[in-house]
């Protein structure tokens, strides 16, 4: 093994590394000149066949050549990696002066916003917001409200009943059909006088269509104090409607029957579109109120003495009034929403126009 042959192998390897212009090309050169089948590797294996006096000299020369090759390989790899990193930094550079992509602003659901708007109106009047469980005992949902066992509302055609243990038929629990149970809980647990507003989800066995949904939202109000009359109820209703629809709005009460109030009434408000001008005027029909001039909002009345007694309140000393209405219905009035399904399907095209305020 001649010294010039070892030098030639070394020089060929160094030249191949220097000529590599990428890490992939360098890898190919590495395999060719430092791998198990490379010339220097083969020369190293041939040393064992040399005469004893030539082994030391040949081994020294091959070792020095391989050391130079490995050093050159490491240096060239470091250079190519530095070039690659510099190129990536340039190619992936971010121009921080460019305008960023605008993220679409979200919007709260209008039902939530309207519910909180109504709460704010009554909180400003001194009422407290009260909440209760949605899976409610039948006593709170029916019995305490003077709704007897034979009342139609207690049938499966109107109410979701919760199964008993191990699939038993009766559990004494229903999905509340109104937020009135929160009124009962408030009257039982709070010191008199009681002034609470009770918003929340309620459940009825209705099919989802343009005007009905099995899950909807109510706001109910309860006031219990000494000397309250229907005049106080009427003034409270007027203030709520005027706060929501404008100072020119009016309300009226029509006699009705509810088991939990006596006397009871349906609450109507002046049509906010035609202001009553469509009544008897075929030239100016109003779709909102069907040219009747008034829109029904909900039920109200003075709390039935039996309900007060069920809550441990002396009906001879205290009186109270209550009312309730659906928030979905109120939203349909305020914004001419024609299909209740739009409120529950989660389509952002419905919520986006409302933004943060309504």
Curated annotation (Swiss-Prot):
InterPro entries: aa-tRNA-synth_II (IPR006195), aa-tRNA-synth_II/BPL/LPL (IPR045864), Phe-tRNA-synth_IIc_asu (IPR004529), Phe-tRNA_ligase_II_N (IPR004188), Phe_tRNA_ligase_alpha1_bac (IPR022911), Phenylalanyl-tRNA_Synthase (IPR002319), tRNA-bd_arm (IPR010978). Its EC number is 6.1.1.20. Signal peptide: none annotated. The keyword Magnesium applies. Keywords: Aminoacyl-tRNA synthetase, ATP-binding, Cytoplasm, Ligase, Magnesium, Metal-binding, Nucleotide-binding, Protein biosynthesis. PROSITE patterns: AA_TRNA_LIGASE_II. It catalyses: tRNA(Phe) + L-phenylalanine + ATP = L-phenylalanyl-tRNA(Phe) + AMP + diphosphate + H(+). One of its GO terms (molecular function) is tRNA binding. Mg(2+) binds at residue 262. It is found in: Cytoplasm. It is an enzyme of class 6 (ligase). One of its GO terms (biological process) is phenylalanyl-tRNA aminoacylation. HAMAP family: Phe_tRNA_synth_alpha1. Tetramer of two alpha and two beta subunits. This is Phenylalanine--tRNA ligase alpha subunit. It comes from Streptomyces coelicolor (strain ATCC BAA-471 / A3(2) / M145). The lineage of its organism: Bacteria, Bacillati, Actinomycetota, Actinomycetes, Kitasatosporales. The gene is pheS.
